[in-house]
Design a protein with these regions (language model features):
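Short, solvent-exposed cationic patches
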Residues: 1-3, 53-73, 106-110
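Charged, gly/pro-rich active-site loop segments
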Residues: 1-5, 75-146
């Protein structure tokens, strides 16, 4: 069976409903490294937060090429793309924090009960956002899904 190319916008619509995926990055020795993450789809990208000491952060900073994989009920998609890592959230207000807040809202589909607490936790944990910009998608969307 050949994997069918899928429009990036259609793939992102599917990924937005799933919210759990696997980011595959390239280690310094060329081997793949994978991590499961909860993501949000925002403005044509896939976004998730990370702690700054994770392997995926170092791998992406060295080589931004990634694959992001999602699957659900017999459907699966692999997005090829590039990823960028935001600056560490060091202030409770600003662009880095705005990205983390928008990602939380999209994943949780609700407001946080205490935004001050959320902001302080993001700064304390030195959170960063990873943004994946898909360039192509292949896979299979089960007709039952749509």
């Amino acid at each position: 069976m050949d994997l069918t190319p899928i429009a990036v916008t259609d793939g992102l619509a599917f990924a937005a409903d799933i919210q759990l995926g696997t980011i595959i990055t390239i280690r310094s020795d060329g081997r793949p490294q994978s991590s499961d993450v909860h993501h949000a789809v925002l403005d044509g990208t896939i976004v998730f937060s990370v702690r700054p000491d994770r392997a995926k952060v170092f791998n992406i900073e060295r080589d931004g090429r990634v694959v992001y994989h999602v699957s659900h009920e017999g459907s699966y998609l692999s997005f090829d793309g590039t990823a960028e890592v935001s600056p560490i959230a060091t202030e409770t207000h600003g662009p880095a924090m705005d990205t983390l807040i928008n990602a939380f809202r999209a994943v949780a589909k609700k407001e946080h009960p205490d935004w001050d607490e959320f902001r302080e936790a993001m700064v304390r944990e030195r959170r960063r956002a990873i943004t994946v910009t898909p360039t192509s998608v292949v896979g299979l969307i089960n007709p039952v899904w749509g």
